[in-house]
Amino acid sequence: MKFSLFFSVFFLAVLHACLSESEIDLEDEEHFMSSDSFLSEIQDESRGKTCIERNKECTNDRHGCCRGKIFKDKCTCVKNGKTEKCVCTQKKWAKIIESYIGDIPALPKPVDDKCVPKHADCSKRKDDCCKGGIFKYQCKCYDMYDDDGEKTDLCGCVSPVEHQAIEGALRIAKKLIGDRWGR
């Protein structure tokens, strides 16, 4: 019980830290990155250095592998007698996650700053669904056939099953933690 309680509190703390960042925080970070600081000088220096592509030799520069879509590739070394050969590779778990997530596109701006509410027709604006709870709703379309056999699309903004499961688990964890501490 202590183990699960510890990890649920830790998960909620990390989730709160991720979700609590506002636009003001982002503006402060942009200002800090543009200022003449030690960190920005280091980043400028590291940008000038070329990275080693995947499946290329990295024996002389083990920390110089390029990034994938999300994660940085790792320099994997193999000893053959007295010689050691190193190659930039992508870890198996990183490959699985990147293939599942795919490219991370920027969220499109809604038309007229109004989003499509939950269960409303989104056939003309598939990328403009509103945000509900933690996640943004997604436009889901179904093929409908009328009495004449003509096919039409029925589209609506809905919450995917995996998002519903995560939000439900967080609600239960909140309730358990609140009941445990008398809140």
From Swiss-Prot:
It holds the Pfam family Toxin_35. Disulfide bonds join 51-66, 58-75, 65-88, 77-86, 115-130, 122-139, 129-157, 141-155. Expressed by the venom gland. It comes from the Eukaryota. Residues 51-141 are annotated as: 2 X approximate repeats with cysteine pattern C-C-CC-C-C. One of its GO terms (molecular function) is toxin activity. InterPro entries: Spider_toxin_CSTX_knottin, Spider_toxin_CSTX_Knottin_CS. GO terms for cellular component: extracellular region; membrane; other organism cell membrane. Residues 164-177 are annotated as: Predicted alpha-helix. Domain repeats lie at residues 51-77, 115-141. Cleavage of the propeptide depends on the processing quadruplet motif (XXXR, with at least one of X being E). It is found in: Secreted; Target cell membrane. A motif (Processing quadruplet motif) lies at residues 44-47. Spider venom toxin that exhibits cytolytic activity by forming an alpha-helix across the membrane. Lethal to insect larvae. Causes instant paralysis and death in the larvae of the flesh fly (S.carnaria) at doses of 20 ug/g, at doses of less than 10 ug/g causes reversible paralysis. Has cytolytic activity against insect Sf9 cells. Causes stable and irreversible depolarization of fly muscle fibers, leading to contracture at higher toxin concentrations. Destabilizes membranes. The presence of 'disulfide through disulfide knots' structurally defines this protein as a knottin. This toxin contains 2 'disulfide through disulfide knots' that are separated by a short linker. This is DELTA-miturgitoxin-Cp1a. The lineage of its organism: Eukaryota, Metazoa, Ecdysozoa, Arthropoda, Chelicerata.
